[in-house]
Each structure stands twice: as structure tokens, then as C-alpha cells.
Amino acid sequence: MIRDWDSLKAAVAGGAQLKYIFFWGHRAPKDGSVGKSCFSQWWPSPFEINGVGYATAEHYMMAEKARLFGDEAACAAILQAATPAEAKKLGAQVSGFVEEIWQLHRFGIVVAGNRARFEQNPLIREFLVNTGERVLVEASPVDRI
């Protein structure tokens, strides 16, 4: 099972024939159903971790970034952000930010947020489960993480 970048590289190097789901964007299909855009950090899927509510996984990631660097004011502002774009903008202004430290923690933060949101939102959980063994790939042309 592919769980991270290293296991994906090993599977490809070993000749595994993998299937991928490429996604980008966070808007629902026109019919209102859940589609692959639910994998976006910006998809509206409220969840809680340790009694704190998050509107999107982007809010969680940016709040954790602020916590990691001890910027409680930024964390509070991120939690109140009306949109994931606003949360991302506030996250870019976290004081005390050190790229090398962020690189060590960001993957685990993203995983924790996504585990919580998929566990707590049955419709997107079902969509995720139905992807089977396919590898999810965010195909954003503008954002690496």
C-alpha cells in the first residue's frame, strides 16, 4: 500500500503498475455531488481536533503552522478566517517561521488534518474509500504544499 512519497517511489522503481487520480480545485461538480475536488485542502469539510473546529484542512494546516512557531495571534486569526485563501494568506505571515523546521513537520500536519476531516465527514470518506488503491495526486500548477 502506498502511504507516503518513499513508498510510492519504491513501488514505481519496483515496476508496480499504479493508477492515479489527479485533482485540483475545490469546487463541487455542477450537480452538487462529491467528486475528486473533495481531496483539496480547500474543500469545505468542517472537522474538530482536540475540541478545536476547522472549516477546511487549509485552516488546520495554517493554524498548526502558527502553533509550531509559537504565533498564537496568527493561529487565532487563521481559525477565524472566512475562507481558505484568507487562512493561507495569514499562514504566510506567521512570525518566527523557519523553512527547514516547516519541511520537517508539514507532511505529518497535512496527514493529521486529512485523517480527521475524512473520518468526520461520511460523504467524502465514502468517496475516498471508493478510490481503492489508486494514488491521489494534487496536480496544482501553482502550489507545491
Which role fits each region the language model picked out?
Residues 1-145:
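Charged, low-complexity intrinsically disordered segments
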